[in-house]
């Protein structure tokens, strides 16, 4: 991995005469400290290829049916671990999807450890990495307690053998340190997860809703939240299957929206369709009916090859090119490199309008009122006599 600021940092290192290039520049003109000389606007994550043909993903399971079933059993245990700890630790949805993405990447490149306890230790390290990447990290003891509870209830327990809880906690702690280092090194410190759950929230955030989407008609504004929620559910449910190995995050978000749009058109509003160039204006990937129909078909093949779950879409994924054409209206892109509306050089100015400022002010006021209301409920005002008897704190 090479950071874009590495050369600038190297140039600023002390030379033999004890002066840095930054010192020389400052001596030539007015002395000014510019942190951009030492650090870039953003740090670029390493870029690796994490999408593959669906046939290669299925082949990764192998050809020995007995080994395939054992592999699936270990994978199911890890996915169950993510699901249980997501509820136990009240993790964000995008942390759960990030853990599933990292898990399938690791499996595709390196396979899984041979035993279920080792797989749980691996899953714990992946979940910790996802949590550190996507949200505020939790205390280590929280992970250890939740993992031990999972191993006691759902993990393998030999007949007649009673687990020593305290001993298990120390083992889980040691394995967490070991596997976390291993996962980060083997994945090349590539934390550019391309998380579709995070992307869908960013693409349709309040900022873009008030700056970019002002031309959307009222009828679409009214029904779009329903489609957006269905797309969110679709993305979360894809975590249990290796769909993240099939396409990148932006394409998966588009896939989810089109699935939600087709479903909405079939069940509720036959005349529904996305506006002209809806995806071209919002996604830095090429979207065509043929590409999306192919992905639906490949998704269906992966479901059949991997896990039979209640969340599987099954025949609902049998969506044709004609059905997709009815809900999208995209111009053909002649340039093989699609336009990226989220390029840093384009968005760094942070243009805003009055509507966004009013929206932001309203949200801040609502948040402030809610916090004050909750605080007054949790901490009722004390009687004056009781306040007077309290000693001051130093």
Swiss-Prot record:
- Any one GO molecular function term: cyclin-dependent protein serine/threonine kinase regulator activity
Its keywords, alphabetically, are: Cell cycle, Nucleus, Transcription, Transcription regulation
What PANTHER family does the entry give? CYCLIN
Asked whether the keyword Kinase is assigned, the reply is no
Stretches for region Disordered: 1-32, 372-394
A GO BP annotation = regulation of transcription by RNA polymerase II
| Localization, UniProt | Nucleus
Name of this chain's protein: Protein BUR2
């Amino acid at each position: 991995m090479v950071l874009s600021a590495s050369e600038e940092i190297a140039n600023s290192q002390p030379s033999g005469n004890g002066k840095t290039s930054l010192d020389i520049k400052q001596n030539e003109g007015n002395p000014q400290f510019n942190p951009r000389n030492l650090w870039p606007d953003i740090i670029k994550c390493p870029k690796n290829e994490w999408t593959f043909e669906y046939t290669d993903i299925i082949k990764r399971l192998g050809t020995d049916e007995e080994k395939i079933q054992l592999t699936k059993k270990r994978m199911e245990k890890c996915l169950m671990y993510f699901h249980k700890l997501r509820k136990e630790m009240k993790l964000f949805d995008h942390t759960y999807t990030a853990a599933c993405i990292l898990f399938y990447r690791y499996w595709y490149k390196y396979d899984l450890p041979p035993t279920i306890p080792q797989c749980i230790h691996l899953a714990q390290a992946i979940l910790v990495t996802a949590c550190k990447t996507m949200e505020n990290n939790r205390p280590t003891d929280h992970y250890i307690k939740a993992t031990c509870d999972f191993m006691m209830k759902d993990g393998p327990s030999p007949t007649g053998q009673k687990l020593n809880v305290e001993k298990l906690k120390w083992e889980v702690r040691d394995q967490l340190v070991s596997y976390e280092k291993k996962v980060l090194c083997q994945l090349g410190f590539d934390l550019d997860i391309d998380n579709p759950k995070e992307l869908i929230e960013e693409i349709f955030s309040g900022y873009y809703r008030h700056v970019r989407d002002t031309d959307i008609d009222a009828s679409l504004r009214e029904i779009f939240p329903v489609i957006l929620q269905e797309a969110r559910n679709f993305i979360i449910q894809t975590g249990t299957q290796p769909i993240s190995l099939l396409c990148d995050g932006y394409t998966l978000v588009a896939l989810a929206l089109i699935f939600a749009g087709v479903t909405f058109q079939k069940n509720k509003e036959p005349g529904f369709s996305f506006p002209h160039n809806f995806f071209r204006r919002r996604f830095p990937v090429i979207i065509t009916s043929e590409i999306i129909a192919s992905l639906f078909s490949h998704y269906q093949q992966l479901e059949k090859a991997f896990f039979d779950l209640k969340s599987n879409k099954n025949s609902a994924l049998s969506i044709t090119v004609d059905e997709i054409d009815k809900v999208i209206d995209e111009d053909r892109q002649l340039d093989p490199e699609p336009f990226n509306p989220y390029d840093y050089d384009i968005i760094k100015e942070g243009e805003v309008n009055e509507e966004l400022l009013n929206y932001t002010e309203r949200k801040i006021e609502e948040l402030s009122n809610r916090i004050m209301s909750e605080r007054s409920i949790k901490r009722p005002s004390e009687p004056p006599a009781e306040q007077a008897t309290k000693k001051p704190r130093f």
